[in-house]
Amino acid sequence: MESAQDNQGRILLVDDESAILRTFRYCLEDEGYSVATANSAAQAETLLQRQVFDLCFLDLRLGEDNGLDVLAQMRIQAPWMRVVIVTAHSAIDTAVDAIQAGAADYLVKPCSPDQLRLATAKQLEVRQLSARLEALEGEIRKPKDGLDSHSPAMMAVLETARQVAITDANILILGESGTGKGELARAIHGWSKRARKACVTINCPSLNAELMESELFGHTRGAFTGASESTLGRVSQADGGTLFLDEIGDFPLTLQPKLLRFIQDKEYERVGDPVTRRADVRILAATNLNLEEMVRESRFREDLLYRLNVITLHLPPLRERSEDILILADRFLARFVKEYSRPARGFSDEARTALLNYRWPGNIRELRNVVERASIICPQERVEISHLGMGEQPAGSAPRVGAALSLDELERAHIGAVLAASDTLDQAAKTLGIDASTLYRKRKQYNL
Protein backbone atom coordinates (compact mmCIF):
# COMPACT_ATOMS: atom_id res chain seq x y z
CA MET A 1 0.00 0.00 0.00
CA GLU A 2 1.31 3.44 -0.91
CA SER A 3 1.91 6.09 1.71
CA ALA A 4 0.17 9.44 1.71
CA GLN A 5 2.39 12.31 0.73
CA ASP A 6 3.63 14.50 3.57
CA ASN A 7 3.43 17.90 1.90
CA GLN A 8 0.58 17.54 -0.60
CA GLY A 9 -2.56 15.63 0.35
CA ARG A 10 -3.74 12.64 -1.62
CA ILE A 11 -7.39 13.11 -2.59
CA LEU A 12 -10.08 10.67 -3.78
CA LEU A 13 -13.04 11.94 -5.84
CA VAL A 14 -16.13 9.71 -5.99
CA ASP A 15 -18.95 10.78 -8.34
CA ASP A 16 -20.92 9.12 -11.12
CA GLU A 17 -20.85 12.28 -13.26
CA SER A 18 -17.69 12.37 -15.36
CA ALA A 19 -17.96 16.13 -15.89
CA ILE A 20 -17.91 16.76 -12.13
CA LEU A 21 -14.94 14.43 -11.69
CA ARG A 22 -13.04 16.15 -14.49
CA THR A 23 -13.71 19.68 -13.16
CA PHE A 24 -12.79 18.79 -9.58
CA ARG A 25 -9.68 16.94 -10.69
CA TYR A 26 -8.31 19.78 -12.83
CA CYS A 27 -8.94 22.31 -10.07
CA LEU A 28 -7.19 20.26 -7.37
CA GLU A 29 -4.28 19.12 -9.54
CA ASP A 30 -3.60 22.77 -10.37
CA GLU A 31 -3.10 23.26 -6.62
CA GLY A 32 -0.49 20.49 -6.59
CA TYR A 33 -2.60 17.76 -5.00
CA SER A 34 -2.44 14.11 -6.06
CA VAL A 35 -5.94 13.12 -7.22
CA ALA A 36 -7.60 9.78 -8.00
CA THR A 37 -11.17 9.36 -9.27
CA ALA A 38 -13.87 6.70 -9.01
CA ASN A 39 -17.32 6.70 -10.62
CA SER A 40 -18.81 3.98 -8.41
CA ALA A 41 -18.67 2.57 -4.89
CA ALA A 42 -16.89 -0.54 -6.19
CA GLN A 43 -14.14 1.52 -7.85
CA ALA A 44 -13.71 3.59 -4.69
CA GLU A 45 -13.38 0.45 -2.57
CA THR A 46 -10.70 -0.91 -4.92
CA LEU A 47 -8.71 2.33 -4.78
CA LEU A 48 -8.91 2.42 -0.98
CA GLN A 49 -7.45 -1.08 -0.87
CA ARG A 50 -4.45 0.00 -2.94
CA GLN A 51 -3.70 3.53 -1.77
CA VAL A 52 -3.84 5.77 1.29
CA PHE A 53 -5.94 8.92 0.92
CA ASP A 54 -6.15 11.90 3.24
CA LEU A 55 -9.41 13.32 1.90
CA CYS A 56 -12.40 12.14 -0.11
CA PHE A 57 -15.13 14.13 -1.85
CA LEU A 58 -18.11 11.75 -2.00
CA ASP A 59 -21.29 12.33 -4.02
CA LEU A 60 -24.38 11.21 -2.11
CA ARG A 61 -26.03 10.09 -5.37
CA LEU A 62 -24.00 7.29 -6.93
CA GLY A 63 -26.42 5.68 -9.33
CA GLU A 64 -27.80 2.64 -7.56
CA ASP A 65 -25.37 3.01 -4.63
CA ASN A 66 -26.47 4.80 -1.46
CA GLY A 67 -23.93 7.43 -0.47
CA LEU A 68 -24.56 6.86 3.24
CA ASP A 69 -23.75 3.17 2.83
CA VAL A 70 -20.56 4.07 0.95
CA LEU A 71 -19.64 6.49 3.75
CA ALA A 72 -20.13 3.78 6.37
CA GLN A 73 -17.84 1.43 4.44
CA MET A 74 -15.20 4.16 4.10
CA ARG A 75 -15.27 4.81 7.84
CA ILE A 76 -14.38 1.14 8.33
CA GLN A 77 -11.87 0.87 5.50
CA ALA A 78 -10.04 4.20 6.05
CA PRO A 79 -11.05 5.69 9.43
CA TRP A 80 -8.30 8.36 9.24
CA MET A 81 -9.60 9.78 5.93
CA ARG A 82 -11.63 12.99 5.97
CA VAL A 83 -14.84 12.68 3.92
CA VAL A 84 -16.69 15.70 2.49
CA ILE A 85 -20.16 15.00 1.12
CA VAL A 86 -21.08 16.61 -2.21
CA THR A 87 -24.83 17.06 -2.59
CA ALA A 88 -27.56 19.01 -4.34
CA HIS A 89 -29.76 21.56 -2.55
CA SER A 90 -32.62 19.09 -2.45
CA ALA A 91 -30.56 16.58 -0.42
CA ILE A 92 -29.18 18.84 2.33
CA ASP A 93 -31.11 16.92 5.00
CA THR A 94 -29.35 13.75 3.89
CA ALA A 95 -26.01 15.57 4.01
CA VAL A 96 -26.69 16.47 7.64
CA ASP A 97 -27.40 12.78 8.30
CA ALA A 98 -24.06 11.99 6.68
CA ILE A 99 -22.21 14.37 9.01
CA GLN A 100 -23.87 12.67 11.97
CA ALA A 101 -22.63 9.39 10.50
CA GLY A 102 -19.02 10.59 10.38
CA ALA A 103 -18.59 12.89 7.39
CA ALA A 104 -16.43 15.94 8.05
CA ASP A 105 -18.44 18.50 6.04
CA TYR A 106 -20.55 18.92 2.91
CA LEU A 107 -20.51 20.99 -0.29
CA VAL A 108 -23.60 21.96 -2.25
CA LYS A 109 -23.49 21.54 -6.04
CA PRO A 110 -22.68 23.48 -8.06
CA CYS A 111 -19.70 24.76 -6.08
CA SER A 112 -17.08 27.23 -7.26
CA PRO A 113 -13.36 26.42 -7.57
CA ASP A 114 -12.68 28.73 -4.63
CA GLN A 115 -15.15 26.81 -2.45
CA LEU A 116 -13.51 23.54 -3.45
CA ARG A 117 -10.01 24.83 -2.75
CA LEU A 118 -11.04 26.28 0.61
CA ALA A 119 -12.77 23.06 1.70
CA THR A 120 -9.73 21.03 0.64
CA ALA A 121 -7.23 23.19 2.50
CA LYS A 122 -9.39 23.18 5.63
CA GLN A 123 -9.84 19.40 5.73
CA LEU A 124 -6.20 18.63 4.98
CA GLU A 125 -5.13 20.97 7.78
CA VAL A 126 -7.41 19.08 10.17
CA ARG A 127 -5.98 15.79 8.88
CA GLN A 128 -2.42 17.00 9.55
CA LEU A 129 -3.35 18.11 13.06
CA SER A 130 -4.96 14.72 13.71
CA ALA A 131 -1.82 12.96 12.51
CA ARG A 132 0.32 15.06 14.85
CA LEU A 133 -2.00 14.27 17.74
CA GLU A 134 -1.79 10.55 16.95
CA ALA A 135 2.01 10.83 16.93
CA LEU A 136 2.01 12.59 20.29
CA GLU A 137 -0.31 9.97 21.74
CA GLY A 138 2.03 7.32 20.40
CA GLU A 139 4.89 8.99 22.25
CA ILE A 140 2.80 9.00 25.42
CA ARG A 141 2.17 5.27 25.04
CA LYS A 142 5.82 4.41 24.40
CA PRO A 143 7.56 2.73 27.34
CA LYS A 144 9.38 5.34 29.43
CA ASP A 145 12.66 4.98 31.29
CA GLY A 146 12.48 1.82 33.35
CA LEU A 147 9.15 0.70 31.89
CA ASP A 148 10.58 -1.13 28.88
CA SER A 149 11.70 -4.15 30.86
CA HIS A 150 13.11 -7.64 30.34
CA SER A 151 12.71 -8.50 34.03
CA PRO A 152 9.93 -11.07 34.68
CA ALA A 153 8.94 -9.27 37.89
CA MET A 154 8.67 -5.90 36.18
CA MET A 155 6.96 -7.32 33.11
CA ALA A 156 4.27 -8.81 35.36
CA VAL A 157 3.68 -5.41 36.97
CA LEU A 158 3.43 -3.71 33.57
CA GLU A 159 1.01 -6.33 32.27
CA THR A 160 -1.27 -5.77 35.25
CA ALA A 161 -0.93 -1.99 34.86
CA ARG A 162 -2.01 -2.15 31.22
CA GLN A 163 -5.01 -4.31 32.11
CA VAL A 164 -6.27 -2.02 34.86
CA ALA A 165 -5.42 1.21 33.00
CA ILE A 166 -8.55 0.93 30.86
CA THR A 167 -10.74 0.94 33.97
CA ASP A 168 -11.41 3.87 36.29
CA ALA A 169 -10.20 1.99 39.37
CA ASN A 170 -8.01 3.93 41.80
CA ILE A 171 -4.45 2.60 41.82
CA LEU A 172 -1.80 2.74 44.55
CA ILE A 173 1.79 2.37 43.29
CA LEU A 174 4.33 1.19 45.86
CA GLY A 175 8.10 1.09 45.53
CA GLU A 176 11.40 2.47 46.73
CA SER A 177 12.49 5.98 45.83
CA GLY A 178 13.70 6.17 42.24
CA THR A 179 11.94 3.04 40.94
CA GLY A 180 9.79 4.97 38.46
CA LYS A 181 6.47 5.31 40.27
CA GLY A 182 5.73 8.65 38.64
CA GLU A 183 6.57 7.34 35.18
CA LEU A 184 4.29 4.35 35.70
CA ALA A 185 1.46 6.64 36.83
CA ARG A 186 1.83 8.77 33.69
CA ALA A 187 1.99 5.64 31.54
CA ILE A 188 -1.23 4.33 33.10
CA HIS A 189 -2.89 7.64 32.26
CA GLY A 190 -1.56 7.38 28.70
CA TRP A 191 -2.95 3.85 28.33
CA SER A 192 -6.36 4.84 29.72
CA LYS A 193 -9.49 6.19 28.05
CA ARG A 194 -8.68 9.49 29.78
CA ALA A 195 -5.43 9.95 27.85
CA ARG A 196 -6.66 13.00 25.91
CA LYS A 197 -7.41 14.82 29.14
CA ALA A 198 -4.93 16.17 31.67
CA CYS A 199 -2.80 14.15 34.05
CA VAL A 200 -2.24 16.53 36.97
CA THR A 201 0.39 15.82 39.64
CA ILE A 202 0.53 17.00 43.24
CA ASN A 203 3.76 16.46 45.18
CA CYS A 204 2.35 15.84 48.66
CA PRO A 205 5.49 16.44 50.81
CA SER A 206 5.92 19.96 49.44
CA LEU A 207 2.74 21.45 50.97
CA ASN A 208 1.30 21.87 54.46
CA ALA A 209 -2.41 21.28 55.17
CA GLU A 210 -3.59 24.82 54.39
CA LEU A 211 -1.64 25.13 51.17
CA MET A 212 -2.54 21.57 50.16
CA GLU A 213 -6.29 22.26 50.45
CA SER A 214 -5.95 25.37 48.30
CA GLU A 215 -3.72 23.60 45.78
CA LEU A 216 -6.05 20.62 45.57
CA PHE A 217 -9.49 22.24 45.58
CA GLY A 218 -8.75 25.87 44.71
CA HIS A 219 -9.70 29.03 46.58
CA THR A 220 -11.56 32.30 46.18
CA ARG A 221 -9.97 35.71 46.30
CA GLY A 222 -9.46 36.80 49.90
CA ALA A 223 -10.00 33.30 51.31
CA PHE A 224 -6.79 33.65 53.32
CA THR A 225 -3.86 36.01 53.71
CA GLY A 226 -2.09 36.34 50.38
CA ALA A 227 -5.01 35.01 48.30
CA SER A 228 -5.03 37.97 45.92
CA GLU A 229 -6.91 36.11 43.18
CA SER A 230 -9.09 33.04 42.80
CA THR A 231 -7.66 29.71 41.62
CA LEU A 232 -9.37 26.65 40.18
CA GLY A 233 -7.32 23.97 41.96
CA ARG A 234 -5.77 20.77 40.66
CA VAL A 235 -9.01 18.78 40.94
CA SER A 236 -10.72 21.15 38.52
CA GLN A 237 -7.71 21.04 36.18
CA ALA A 238 -7.86 17.24 36.17
CA ASP A 239 -11.61 17.05 35.45
CA GLY A 240 -12.14 14.25 32.95
CA GLY A 241 -8.56 13.09 33.40
CA THR A 242 -6.26 11.81 36.13
CA LEU A 243 -5.01 13.22 39.44
CA PHE A 244 -1.68 11.75 40.55
CA LEU A 245 -0.93 12.12 44.27
CA ASP A 246 2.82 11.59 44.50
CA GLU A 247 4.13 10.49 47.92
CA ILE A 248 0.61 10.15 49.33
CA GLY A 249 2.05 9.02 52.67
CA ASP A 250 2.93 12.67 53.32
CA PHE A 251 -0.60 13.92 52.65
CA PRO A 252 -1.69 16.02 55.69
CA LEU A 253 -3.68 13.90 58.16
CA THR A 254 -6.08 16.76 58.95
CA LEU A 255 -7.03 17.06 55.27
CA GLN A 256 -7.48 13.35 54.61
CA PRO A 257 -11.26 13.39 55.39
CA LYS A 258 -11.83 15.94 52.60
CA LEU A 259 -9.77 13.89 50.17
CA LEU A 260 -11.74 10.79 51.18
CA ARG A 261 -15.03 12.58 50.59
CA PHE A 262 -13.91 13.72 47.15
CA ILE A 263 -12.80 10.23 46.16
CA GLN A 264 -16.12 8.75 47.35
CA ASP A 265 -18.57 11.40 46.10
CA LYS A 266 -16.58 13.36 43.47
CA GLU A 267 -17.65 16.52 45.33
CA TYR A 268 -15.60 19.33 46.86
CA GLU A 269 -15.64 23.01 47.84
CA ARG A 270 -13.01 25.60 47.14
CA VAL A 271 -11.44 27.30 50.14
CA GLY A 272 -13.61 30.31 51.03
CA ASP A 273 -16.51 29.24 48.80
CA PRO A 274 -19.53 27.24 50.10
CA VAL A 275 -20.61 26.14 46.61
CA THR A 276 -20.29 22.37 46.15
CA ARG A 277 -18.67 21.38 42.88
CA ARG A 278 -18.17 18.07 41.12
CA ALA A 279 -15.26 16.71 39.11
CA ASP A 280 -14.81 13.43 37.24
CA VAL A 281 -11.28 12.46 38.23
CA ARG A 282 -9.42 9.16 38.36
CA ILE A 283 -7.03 8.90 41.33
CA LEU A 284 -3.53 7.45 41.11
CA ALA A 285 -1.28 7.58 44.18
CA ALA A 286 2.28 6.52 44.94
CA THR A 287 4.48 6.18 48.00
CA ASN A 288 7.66 4.58 49.28
CA LEU A 289 6.22 4.42 52.80
CA ASN A 290 4.42 1.55 54.56
CA LEU A 291 0.87 2.91 54.70
CA GLU A 292 -0.46 -0.07 56.67
CA GLU A 293 2.09 0.63 59.39
CA MET A 294 1.11 4.30 59.30
CA VAL A 295 -2.53 3.29 59.78
CA ARG A 296 -1.59 1.26 62.85
CA GLU A 297 0.27 4.30 64.19
CA SER A 298 -2.77 6.55 63.48
CA ARG A 299 -0.75 8.59 60.96
CA PHE A 300 -2.92 7.64 57.98
CA ARG A 301 -6.65 6.99 57.70
CA GLU A 302 -7.60 3.36 57.14
CA ASP A 303 -10.73 4.25 55.15
CA LEU A 304 -8.68 6.45 52.83
CA LEU A 305 -6.17 3.65 52.28
CA TYR A 306 -9.01 1.31 51.29
CA ARG A 307 -10.23 3.86 48.75
CA LEU A 308 -6.77 4.40 47.29
CA ASN A 309 -5.64 0.79 46.95
CA VAL A 310 -8.45 -0.72 44.91
CA ILE A 311 -5.53 -1.92 42.79
CA THR A 312 -1.99 -2.05 44.23
CA LEU A 313 1.11 -2.26 42.05
CA HIS A 314 4.50 -3.05 43.61
CA LEU A 315 7.49 -1.80 41.59
CA PRO A 316 10.59 -3.94 42.18
CA PRO A 317 13.87 -2.16 42.98
CA LEU A 318 16.52 -2.03 40.26
CA ARG A 319 18.74 -4.54 42.12
CA GLU A 320 15.99 -7.12 41.50
CA ARG A 321 15.91 -6.24 37.79
CA SER A 322 19.46 -7.13 36.80
CA GLU A 323 18.28 -7.87 33.25
CA ASP A 324 17.47 -4.18 32.81
CA ILE A 325 20.55 -2.46 34.26
CA LEU A 326 22.77 -2.48 31.17
CA ILE A 327 19.85 -1.82 28.82
CA LEU A 328 18.91 1.28 30.80
CA ALA A 329 22.54 2.37 31.12
CA ASP A 330 23.05 2.14 27.35
CA ARG A 331 19.84 4.09 26.72
CA PHE A 332 20.79 6.84 29.18
CA LEU A 333 24.29 7.07 27.71
CA ALA A 334 22.96 7.44 24.16
CA ARG A 335 20.62 10.19 25.31
CA PHE A 336 23.17 12.17 27.29
CA VAL A 337 26.03 12.01 24.78
CA LYS A 338 23.62 13.41 22.21
CA GLU A 339 22.36 16.09 24.60
CA TYR A 340 25.86 17.18 25.65
CA SER A 341 27.63 16.41 22.34
CA ARG A 342 30.12 14.09 24.04
CA PRO A 343 32.30 11.35 22.44
CA ALA A 344 31.30 8.32 24.56
CA ARG A 345 29.70 5.48 22.61
CA GLY A 346 29.63 2.66 25.15
CA PHE A 347 30.93 1.17 28.39
CA SER A 348 34.11 -0.85 28.88
CA ASP A 349 33.72 -4.44 30.09
CA GLU A 350 34.96 -3.41 33.52
CA ALA A 351 32.45 -0.57 33.71
CA ARG A 352 29.60 -2.87 32.67
CA THR A 353 30.60 -5.36 35.36
CA ALA A 354 30.65 -2.57 37.94
CA LEU A 355 27.19 -1.42 36.88
CA LEU A 356 25.86 -4.96 37.28
CA ASN A 357 27.49 -5.53 40.68
CA TYR A 358 26.34 -2.27 42.25
CA ARG A 359 23.20 -2.48 44.43
CA TRP A 360 21.65 0.82 43.25
CA PRO A 361 20.00 2.05 46.45
CA GLY A 362 18.73 5.05 44.49
CA ASN A 363 17.37 2.76 41.75
CA ILE A 364 16.75 4.12 38.22
CA ARG A 365 17.16 7.73 39.30
CA GLU A 366 20.63 6.97 40.65
CA LEU A 367 21.60 5.02 37.52
CA ARG A 368 20.50 7.93 35.36
CA ASN A 369 22.54 10.38 37.44
CA VAL A 370 25.66 8.17 37.35
CA VAL A 371 25.47 7.73 33.58
CA GLU A 372 24.79 11.43 32.99
CA ARG A 373 27.89 12.35 35.00
CA ALA A 374 29.97 9.74 33.17
CA SER A 375 28.81 10.97 29.77
CA ILE A 376 29.94 14.49 30.64
CA ILE A 377 33.39 13.74 32.05
CA CYS A 378 34.37 10.86 29.74
CA PRO A 379 36.76 12.24 27.06
CA GLN A 380 36.81 9.07 24.94
CA GLU A 381 34.58 6.52 23.24
CA ARG A 382 34.53 4.04 26.15
CA VAL A 383 33.26 4.89 29.62
CA GLU A 384 35.60 3.41 32.25
CA ILE A 385 34.99 2.65 35.94
CA SER A 386 36.74 5.88 36.90
CA HIS A 387 34.16 7.89 34.96
CA LEU A 388 31.30 6.29 36.89
CA GLY A 389 32.48 7.70 40.19
CA MET A 390 31.90 4.33 41.82
CA GLY A 391 35.33 2.70 42.20
CA GLU A 392 35.66 -0.81 43.53
CA GLN A 393 33.32 -0.07 46.44
CA PRO A 394 30.68 2.40 45.25
CA ALA A 395 29.28 4.82 47.78
CA GLY A 396 26.02 3.47 49.13
CA SER A 397 26.58 -0.15 48.09
CA ALA A 398 26.41 -3.00 50.54
CA PRO A 399 29.54 -3.42 52.72
CA ARG A 400 31.98 -6.07 51.56
CA VAL A 401 31.44 -9.36 53.34
CA GLY A 402 33.98 -9.83 56.12
CA ALA A 403 35.24 -6.25 55.81
CA ALA A 404 35.37 -4.04 58.88
CA LEU A 405 34.32 -0.51 57.96
CA SER A 406 35.09 2.57 60.00
CA LEU A 407 32.34 4.99 61.04
CA ASP A 408 33.61 7.44 58.44
CA GLU A 409 33.32 4.80 55.70
CA LEU A 410 29.79 3.93 56.78
CA GLU A 411 28.80 7.61 56.91
CA ARG A 412 30.28 8.25 53.47
CA ALA A 413 28.41 5.27 52.01
CA HIS A 414 25.13 6.35 53.60
CA ILE A 415 25.40 9.98 52.51
CA GLY A 416 26.39 8.90 48.99
CA ALA A 417 23.33 6.66 48.72
CA VAL A 418 20.97 9.38 49.95
CA LEU A 419 22.47 11.94 47.56
CA ALA A 420 22.08 9.56 44.63
CA ALA A 421 18.44 8.89 45.52
CA SER A 422 17.51 12.56 46.01
CA ASP A 423 16.52 15.13 43.41
CA THR A 424 17.90 18.10 45.37
CA LEU A 425 20.43 18.78 48.12
CA ASP A 426 17.64 20.13 50.34
CA GLN A 427 15.76 16.85 49.96
CA ALA A 428 18.91 14.86 50.79
CA ALA A 429 19.59 17.02 53.87
CA LYS A 430 16.02 16.50 55.07
CA THR A 431 16.33 12.73 54.63
CA LEU A 432 19.62 12.70 56.54
CA GLY A 433 18.21 14.90 59.30
CA ILE A 434 20.88 17.59 58.91
CA ASP A 435 20.86 21.12 57.55
CA ALA A 436 22.09 22.02 54.07
CA SER A 437 25.31 23.63 55.32
CA THR A 438 26.28 20.46 57.22
CA LEU A 439 25.59 18.37 54.13
CA TYR A 440 27.78 20.72 52.09
CA ARG A 441 30.68 20.22 54.51
CA LYS A 442 30.20 16.44 54.50
CA ARG A 443 30.27 16.36 50.68
CA LYS A 444 33.57 18.25 50.68
CA GLN A 445 34.94 16.03 53.44
CA TYR A 446 34.12 12.79 51.62
CA ASN A 447 34.62 14.12 48.08
CA LEU A 448 31.03 13.27 47.11
From Swiss-Prot:
Pfam families: HTH_8, Response_reg, Sigma54_activat. ATP binds at residues 175-182, 238-247. SUPFAM superfamilies: CheY-like (SSF52172), Homeodomain-like (SSF46689), P-loop containing nucleoside triphosphate hydrolases (SSF52540). GO terms for biological process: alginic acid biosynthetic process; phosphorelay signal transduction system; regulation of DNA-templated transcription. SMART domains: AAA, REC. The modification 4-aspartylphosphate is found at residue 59. It comes from the Bacteria. GO terms for molecular function: ATP binding; ATP hydrolysis activity; sequence-specific DNA binding. Keywords: Activator, Alginate biosynthesis, ATP-binding, DNA-binding, Nucleotide-binding, Phosphoprotein, Transcription, Transcription regulation, Two-component regulatory system. Residues 425-444 bind DNA. This is Alginate biosynthesis transcriptional regulatory protein AlgB. It comes from Pseudomonas putida (strain ATCC 47054 / DSM 6125 / CFBP 8728 / NCIMB 11950 / KT2440).
